[in-house]
Amino acid sequence: MVTVLMHDMFHAGVHFGHQTRYWNPRMKPFIFGVRNKIHIINLEQTAPMFNNALFELNKIASRKGKILFVGTKRAASEAIKEAARSCDQFFVNHRWLGGMLTNWKTVRQSIKHLKELETQSQDGTLDKLTKKEAIICNRKLEKLEKSLGGIKDLGGLPDALFVIDAEREKIAVKEANNLGIPVFAVVDTNTDPNGIDFIIPGNDDAIRAINLYLTAVAHAISEGHQKNALEI
């Protein structure tokens, strides 16, 4: 089972929070101190909390659970997509569309339309349209792929969310809360941790830190899949 060492977290800058003036007092239990007006996160708490989150994600994956990676900020967008794909999971890495979870029926119709356009693009149907019609269809396909491409094979609601930057993705977190879907999230010092089932106190801006979280999560999920395959 994959585990992450405090030493690796330190070198990835997981302990660097936000400037003190932006802090959320509810993160006080996870803060070690202040350096140069920046809150320092207590890695002695983060390490066991992250490793516990990895253990739980591994269990969900071993039961064939579906995990939705959510991270729409520029620093995380590409890494979110790569990590989710590496462990055969799902992702939202551009704007979260309100109702993606709570209005799944409507989202499912949009996914159906996306797949129809993909088929038409591949079988030459779009080539038979006028130039203007083809441009409109291709733009629509591009837009739908950008917003829904990472969930087009989800097939229903996910069993868990893994979120980079719970503050930015609070609409996704709230929707998951409303539906009773467990939320695993990296929570920085500027964020209210309420609504997060598995809190990972840590830097949610540094690319090295983001890569550390995503690599470990993808490995934990892949190991869970292997466990399931062995049991079968």
Swiss-Prot record:
UniProt entry tagged with the keyword Glycoprotein: no
Gene Ontology terms describing biological process: translation
InterPro entries named in the record: Ribosomal_uS2 (IPR001865), Ribosomal_uS2_bac/mit/plastid (IPR005706), Ribosomal_uS2_CS (IPR018130), Ribosomal_uS2_flav_dom_sf (IPR023591)
Alphabetical keyword list: Ribonucleoprotein, Ribosomal protein
Keyword set includes Protein biosynthesis: no
A Pfam family annotated for this UniProt entry: Ribosomal_S2
GO cellular component labels: cytosolic small ribosomal subunit
UniProt superkingdom: Bacteria
Family matches, as SUPFAM superfamilies: Ribosomal protein S2 (SSF52313)
GO MF annotations in UniProt: structural constituent of ribosome
Family (UniProt): Belongs to the universal ribosomal protein uS2 family.
NCBIfam families named in the record: rpsB_bact
Name listed for the protein in its UniProt record: Small ribosomal subunit protein uS2
Organism: Baumannia cicadellinicola subsp. Homalodisca coagulata
Organism taxonomic ancestry: Bacteria, Pseudomonadati, Pseudomonadota, Gammaproteobacteria, Candidatus Palibaumannia
